[in-house]
């Protein structure tokens, strides 16, 4: 497997805001399900990100992440990233690896890692961590990390929160389990690269290249609006509870019955 040698690393002394984009599944032609994104449109996104990194004068530095470990991450995303010379971070639901149809096995995951892509954990079963305690929480955090480290032979220090759900108890458990970066679903640009919590912008089907370009403008009003919307939805989750909220989420997002991304992926 060809290893990516990116020539678009952040310039020394340049510390812009970072905007992390979150993708899930890619598919040729896309889908009505909002978490499935068109492969060709993803290529256009990556091309834009490379152009912005090459310019090295913009205030926002784009980063690419994927959640869940869908097979399209290997079959569709990796060739695009390699062709453009860009690396991404893939957060893996460990219990699905090699076990759930439509998701990567350890062979594909090793190939991702060996090509130079970064790997992080996304729990063991994709359970909301706020619903877990004791041994269950330990398996979702420490169990997932240790399995990835054993299978890939590398240190795993980043965690993506399933469904973006967390509280102070979960954050403390993540740190205790050895994670030094915790990725959320809060749509915001990050200024401090040393911070523990990292926000991300969830990419949905139908998001145009122009809308992405606008989000990367310094001081983007569109990004600020998305963060306000996120706060409103977070309040709705608290009011309705996860069960009711996720049923509404699945209906509004046209969730496919057999898709790996479930309501727990709602930001």
Question: What is the role of each PLM region?
Answer:
Residues 1-19, 199-267:
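Membrane-proximal basic amphipathic "stem/tether" segments
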Residues 1-50:
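Short glycine- and acidic-rich boundary segments immediately preceding or forming the N-terminal edge
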Residues 12-15, 83, 190-192:
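Extracellular/periplasmic catalytic domains that process cell-envelope and extracellular macromolecules
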Residues 18-28, 32-33, 60-62, 70, ...:
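Metal-dependent polysaccharide deacetylase catalytic core of the NodB/CE4 family, i.e.
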Residues 30, 34-59, 149, 175-193, ...:
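C-terminal domain-boundary segment and adjacent tail
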Residues 93-97, 186-190, 203-204:
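Short, acidic/turn-prone active-site loops that include or flank metal/cofactor-
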Residues 128-129, 190-191, 204-208:
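A short acidic, often aromatic-flanked loop/helix-cap motif at beta-alpha or helix-coil junctions
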